[in-house]
């Protein structure tokens, strides 16, 4: 089991420094691959459409996933509902490359997340803080991402979550070893993982940014804040010029600390996706609060 988990962590590590794009058709997947995406997330609807339509959002139709998988050579991810281990079993049977246990879909279980150790396939999970991140890793997640607030085109929550996680990691590194058990209790996280973070000053898996990233500048901001890479959901194919936006965001992640290049790639992209002021959303419409 440990060998399999180390392999899964290494598979996620190979995506470091890259962009993972949400796609709903094989044609979009091809655009993403040509633009330089390191992986795609196969969906029936991007988060902005899930948010607009409401109702219960579930795992995508296997037919769509298989068509997208056949269209590209890069890894393909797909989402399952929090706690819905049967959806995960189906995706594993389809030969998907990564499973995202996602708060963007309607949770199937409000108490339990999926036992990711029961699967051979690597899992991605969202987190708002270090405790959440370490609990998901303790369940077997091979990759963490900020939850942000998907489908809004508003990066503020992704920034908040990344800063919180980084600050909590930094705090752990200042603690004495005899203080770490109390920290584990406070974080509600496994002691061994808390100890690892305190000793290494980082998570034991890669931590990507996600949720509300809509422009090259947003992507570069998250990279400068310490993200290992970026997920872009609605931001590309809800923009005015998806092909150009996709290429620009990939370049922005590569050259995130080069303002001259960022200025160049941000030029002439047309209008970004329509955005939402998160302060005006009802509590029930906030995806990030799903899961624990």
Curated annotation (Swiss-Prot):
Q: What is the lineage of its organism?
A: Bacteria, Bacillati, Bacillota, Clostridia, Thermoanaerobacterales
Cited CDD domains: pdxS
Alphabetized InterPro entries for the sequence:
Aldolase_TIM, PdxS/SNZ, PdxS/SNZ_N, RibuloseP-bd_barrel
Known role: Catalyzes the formation of pyridoxal 5'-phosphate from ribose 5-phosphate (RBP), glyceraldehyde 3-phosphate (G3P) and ammonia. The ammonia is provided by the PdxT subunit. Can also use ribulose 5-phosphate and dihydroxyacetone phosphate as substrates, resulting from enzyme-catalyzed isomerization of RBP and G3P, respectively.
Biological or metabolic pathway of the protein: Cofactor biosynthesis; pyridoxal 5'-phosphate biosynthesis
UniProt protein name: Pyridoxal 5'-phosphate synthase subunit PdxS
> Which species does the entry assign this protein to?
Thermoanaerobacter pseudethanolicus (strain ATCC 33223 / 39E) (Clostridium thermohydrosulfuricum)
User: Can you tell me which residues bind D-ribose 5-phosphate?
Assistant: 22, 151, 212, 233-234
**Subunit notes for this chain?**
In the presence of PdxT, forms a dodecamer of heterodimers.
- Positions bound to D-glyceraldehyde 3-phosphate: 163
